[in-house]
Amino acid sequence: MDALPIQEQTGKTYASRRAGLMHACGHDGHTASLLGAARMIAQLKASGACEHWYGRLNLIFQPAEENGQDGGGAMAMVNDALFERFPCDQIFGMHNAPTLPLGRVHLRPGAMMASSDRVDVLITGKGGHAAFPHSTIDPTVAAASVVMALQSIVSRNVDPFGNAVISIGRLLAGEHGTHNVIPQQARLELSVRALDPKTRDLLEQRIRELIKLQSESFGCTASVNYRRGYPVLVNHPASSSLVEQVARECFGEDMVDGQTPPIGGSEDFASMLEVRPGCYFLMGNGDGPGSCMVHHPGYDFNDDLLPASIRMWTALAQKLLELR
């Protein structure tokens, strides 16, 4: 459903056969979980156990979350009239969490995961010989100043109780081996994250202003390509309460955290939650020896999570359809 450009190093017999591609985030396991729930619900229906269930249940298998741009697979499905073709009163999504004990459920109402935007910056000066900097307009110095100034946005423009991140992933100026050349241009690549839509807007405004003015103060010009990615993921309070209730009934009080701290990572399911109420939750993939974070060449979805995730999906469907 959604592989990553990573060479798998798990040593499993079922490891990826495609060189340089692997399921490094567990989306194959998520697919198996939902298929397992579909099978369980079909068996319950055949046995007559669903006679008090009312309504229609839509199972959404959404690809391309790892795309990271243009709203990912979620926005593509929304734009393709997903909810007009398959109406939904509420929607729910789940992701495994390698840092949590196996089967433990974490969620929170409100903002749970950050927005994610990408920024490409090109600073242009006037290149020349390194021995004569006075005859140049050095874009490297301007870029270095921009890097430092960007850090003031979070510390001086964002509410201290808010959450925001501006990370510089790349700074490139000049070519290898050109020690005596002041380059014509410098490039920056940024990752920008926020847990509030207003903060997200503020970050874009200040980043654009600061880069322009800071570059001009050195005599350079700057172009900013600001690409909005996934929005803030906001869980609906009533849907979150329902997920928490079902999880506690399935696994017990000590296996549920209904007020988990917000996460700086991003998820395109947020685009679906902008048009339909619902809840996105995490289930522990296990934190024992050998476990590792997603997007790692040694990552493996823990198949021992399948029974718990299938049970969670089935119980949630039952609760929703009985409530109708």
Q: Across the structure, where does each feature detected by a protein language model lie?
A:
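Short acidic-aromatic active-site loops that bind/stabilize oxyanions
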Residues: 23-24, 303
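Enzymes and membrane/adaptor proteins characterized by extended Gly/Ser/Thr/Asp/Glu-rich
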Residues: 8-13, 295-298
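Cytochrome P450 catalytic-core helices
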Residues: 31-36
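Histidine/acidic-residue-rich, glycine-tolerant segments that coordinate divalent metal ions
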Residues: 4, 11-22, 28-29, 40-181, ...
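Active-site metal-binding loops of divalent metal-dependent hydrolases
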Residues: 1, 96, 285-286
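Metal-dependent amide/peptide-bond hydrolase catalytic core
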Residues: 141-324
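Generic structural motif recognizing short loop/turn segments at the entrances and edges of beta-strands
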Residues: 2, 103-105, 220, 297
